[in-house]
Amino acid sequence: MDLKSLIRDVPDFPKPGIIFRDMSPLLQNAEALSFVSHNLLKHVDLTHVDYFAGIESRGFILAAHMAATHKKGFLPIRKAGKLPPPTRKVSYALEYGTAEIELPPGRGNVVIVDDVLATGGTLQAAIDLCLLAGYSVESVAVLVNLTFLNKMTYNDQKVASLVQY
């Protein structure tokens, strides 16, 4: 399936010089969404996975759909201040300043899911957060990997993705 044809390029958004990869058309296509849920993690033995952890906000959509497809639980990795206590928090650097994400503490094996991997800062923070909160990270997966911006790996494996730019 040609997923790239379902990802809209939005030039100069959110600021000049940036090409935003809008996955809204893909999400509106039930066949494509099902394809993503069934094929993004073909390399992962899901029998040991308890949860799909989605990074706010577009990672929620993919992770929740994958969790339902594979009959697993869903964990929301949220911006700080959005979840009731207790939570664990991790700070990470942004282009201008810092951000915090949080997750309830717990146990189990997770696959972390997000829509786009750019520099890897948010994804690395999500990995660190899951470990801090008591979870074991089995794998990480993104729909789109902007490979020209990162060479990120996890446990000596490339981050799973279905679309690369």
Swiss-Prot record:
The keyword Glycosyltransferase applies. It catalyses: AMP + diphosphate = 5-phospho-alpha-D-ribose 1-diphosphate + adenine. It comes from the Bacteria. One of its GO terms (cellular component) is cytoplasm. Its main location: cytoplasm. It is found in: Cytoplasm. Its EC number is 2.4.2.7. GO terms for biological process: adenine salvage; AMP salvage; purine ribonucleoside salvage. It is an enzyme of class 2 (transferase). GO terms for molecular function: adenine binding; adenine phosphoribosyltransferase activity; AMP binding. Homodimer. This is Adenine phosphoribosyltransferase. It comes from Bdellovibrio bacteriovorus (strain ATCC 15356 / DSM 50701 / NCIMB 9529 / HD100).
